[in-house]
A protein has these predicted regions:
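Non-catalytic structural scaffold of enzyme domains
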Residues: 1-166
């Protein structure tokens, strides 16, 4: 049996952001992510000051398939208004790429929105994975809700999700 490899979204987000040399970095993320300070501390170690905004309402809307409503746009406006002129906005939640086109309406044209998912794809592309592997989906939450949320937000049907305790 081969080794299990993991790609962490937080580490990927930090790597890609540092390479961009932001002069005014903002982070939007879920409540627990923002309050944990994980990004703030990591960027402080690299002498990058950040402004953080809790964007929790967006996750629930996206999970319910709402990616373009007036309610979603109003939440985006409220969340992004105080940080709209930052040079870079880091998406610190895997839900937010589903509404990237909406988010762009509420930041200045000079603001770069950072989606760390491409960094993860690039990292995994360098792994020498055997052919014929399988996908495994894990969730610490409700697996049925995750199935519905994946379909609603991204149009992806997940066959089996295993619940794990962390």
């Amino acid at each position: 049996r081969g080794e299990t490899k993991l790609a962490g979204v937080i580490e990927a987000a930090i790597r890609v952001t540092v390479r961009m040399h932001p002069n005014r970095l903002a982070i939007i993320g879920g409540r627990r992510t923002v309050l944990s300070g994980v990004y703030r501390r990591a960027f402080a170690e690299r002498s990058i000051a950040v402004r953080q905004r809790i964007a929790q309402p967006l996750s629930g809307l996206i999970e319910n398939g709402d990616t373009h409503s007036s309610r979603l746009r109003e939440e985006c406006r409220k969340i992004l208004l105080p940080i709209r002129t930052c040079s870079h906005v880091l998406l610190a939640c895997t839900h937010y790429p589903a509404i990237l086109s909406e988010l762009r309406h509420f930041v200045s044209t000079g603001t770069t929105i950072i989606d760390p998912s491409d960094e993860i794809v690039n990292q995994i592309a360098h792994w020498r994975l055997p052919a014929g592997g399988k996908q495994t989906f894990l969730s610490s939450g409700d697996t049925e809700k995750m199935k519905h949320a994946a379909f609603n937000a991204f149009g992806v049907r997940l066959a089996k999700i295993t619940r794990v305790d962390i």
